[in-house]
């Protein structure tokens, strides 16, 4: 139970889970633990690994973990936490994204002990008749208990009928897999409960539910999301990961320790006490960044990332910056930053100039109207973006 509950938001129903654990221990039959992810983006970020870490902990206890790729449900679009209809993905987008999902998840899970499934296996054969029969097992009133549906209904925001199907299809996954426990973020609680109810309808023992907190992004405000730009991708370069993790606030660091670190809780509590007594929290942040980077890359990469970070902090330039060859001199500074790939747009370039975040050969550029002449120089935007530009 201690492993199950570490860092979790809610365990339903705790007494039932204890009974399942006891039965598994007595019979030697591992419990079936399910986690489903819709491949809505091509990469996994560390926010996704909060539930993956929990899966790995339960996997290490000998239970059977099932990594479910929602290739069917992705064509519907999950309405969880949405204030408008989520556009469904095409089959081509789903297939392209799914290719990287399991490979990246295997950085956390033990692939030799992981059952990988696609929910199109049982959802596609249902057909219209099967889906209608499934829909008959749940009422509109129950569906409207969802907080996001209720808010949209009261606000007069349209709710499409197909959005009601999403939690039903996700719940049917639990029936097909005969899961004993389903994991998900706190925003998935309703969907997980639907699975529990549908299992009862199909005469199965209902699954227990374990919800994990949604990881707050680097900004410390909103949940981690690629669309919000406040994320750390698990496939990012070690130096980039290190810089991003060192940018989080000292308070947020402890949340990251609880949800992302494999260190014993007693050790984390001791570090908190040491910081209270005067230890520099930066030291603890370095340890966290190195642990996460070593998990997805290597310990050697983590050490090199620390060296690079310290080098930059002293005003140094990284050794491995890209070299960009451009023509058109003289050229406006904002346009040059865009062409060099250091800023996504000229407006973003101008914002960085206004904030004093642009340097050429170590000199801060404050003139947005600057015309840059031909030459070779190092350009820097913020603390982590560098390029050696050869302009002709």
Swiss-Prot record:
Pfam families, from UniProt?
A: S4, tRNA-synt_1b
Name the keywords, alphabetized.
Aminoacyl-tRNA synthetase, ATP-binding, Cytoplasm, Ligase, Nucleotide-binding, Protein biosynthesis, RNA-binding
Q: Where is this motif: 'HIGH' region?
A: 39-48
EC class name: ligase
Name the Enzyme Commission number(s) assigned to this protein: 6.1.1.1
SUPFAM superfamilies xrefs: Alpha-L RNA-binding motif (SSF55174), Nucleotidylyl transferase (SSF52374)
What are the recorded Gene Ontology BP terms?
Answer: tyrosyl-tRNA aminoacylation
Q: Where does ATP bind?
A: 226
- Which reaction equations make up its catalytic activity? tRNA(Tyr) + L-tyrosine + ATP = L-tyrosyl-tRNA(Tyr) + AMP + diphosphate + H(+)
What subcellular locations does the record give? Cytoplasm
Q: Which GO terms describe its molecular function?
A: ATP binding; RNA binding; tyrosine-tRNA ligase activity
Q: A cellular component term (GO) from this record? A: cytosol
Q: Where does the motif 'KMSKS' region lie?
A: 223-227
Provide the S4 RNA-binding domain boundaries.
331-391
* HAMAP family documented for this protein: Tyr_tRNA_synth_type2 (MF_02007)
What is said about its interaction partners and assembly? Homodimer.
What does the function comment of this entry state? Answer: Catalyzes the attachment of tyrosine to tRNA(Tyr) in a two-step reaction: tyrosine is first activated by ATP to form Tyr-AMP and then transferred to the acceptor end of tRNA(Tyr).
Q: Which family does it belong to?
A: Belongs to the class-I aminoacyl-tRNA synthetase family. TyrS type 2 subfamily.
**Classification via NCBIfam families:** tyrS
Q: What is this protein called?
A: Tyrosine--tRNA ligase
Gene, per the UniProt record: tyrS
């Amino acid at each position: 139970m201690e492993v199950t509950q570490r860092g979790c938001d809610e365990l339903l129903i705790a007494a039932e889970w204890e009974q399942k654990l006891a039965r598994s221990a007595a019979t030697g039959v591992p419990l079936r633990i399910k986690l489903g992810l819709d491949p809505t983006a091509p990469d996994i970020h560390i926010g996704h690994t909060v539930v993956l870490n929990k899966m790995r902990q339960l996997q290490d206890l000998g239970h059977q973990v099932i990594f479910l790729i929602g290739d069917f449900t992705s064509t519907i679009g999950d309405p969880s936490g949405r204030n408008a209809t989520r556009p469904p993905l095409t089959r081509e987008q789903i297939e392209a994204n799914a290719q990287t999902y399991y490979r990246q998840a295997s950085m956390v899970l033990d692939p030799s002990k992981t059952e990988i499934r696609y929910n199109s296996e049982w959802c596609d054969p249902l057909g219209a008749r099967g889906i209608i029969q499934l829909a008959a097992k749940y009422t509109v009133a129950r569906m409207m208990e969802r907080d996001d549906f209720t808010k949209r209904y009261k606000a007069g925001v349209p709710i499409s009928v197909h959005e009601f199907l999403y939690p039903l299809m996700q719940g049917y996954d639990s029936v097909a897999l005969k899961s004993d426990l389903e994991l998900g973020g706190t925003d998935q609680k309703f969907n997980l409960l639907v699975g529990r109810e549908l299992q009862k309808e199909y005469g199965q023992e209902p699954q227990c539910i374990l919800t994990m907190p949604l990881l707050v992004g680097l900004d410390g405000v909103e949940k981690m999301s690629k669309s919000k730009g406040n994320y750390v991708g698990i496939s990012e370069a070690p130096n980039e990961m290190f810089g991003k993790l060192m940018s989080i606030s000292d308070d947020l660091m402890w949340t990251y320790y609880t949800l992302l670190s494999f260190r014993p809780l007693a050790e984390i509590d001791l570090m908190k006490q040491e910081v209270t007594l005067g230890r520099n929290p930066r030291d603890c942040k370095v340890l966290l960044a190195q642990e996460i980077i070593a998990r997805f890359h290597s310990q050697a990469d983590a050490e090199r990332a620390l060296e690079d970070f310290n080098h930059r902090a002293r005003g140094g330039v990284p050794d491995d910056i890209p070299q960009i060859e451009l023509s058109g001199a003289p050229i406006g500074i904002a346009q040059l930053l865009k062409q060099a790939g250091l800023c996504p747009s000229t407006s973003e370039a101008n914002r960085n100039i206004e904030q004093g975040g642009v340097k050429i050969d170590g000199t801060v550029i404050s003139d947005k109207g600057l015309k840059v002449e031909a030459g070779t120089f190092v350009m820097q935007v913020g603390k982590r973006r560098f390029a050696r530009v050869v302009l002709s």
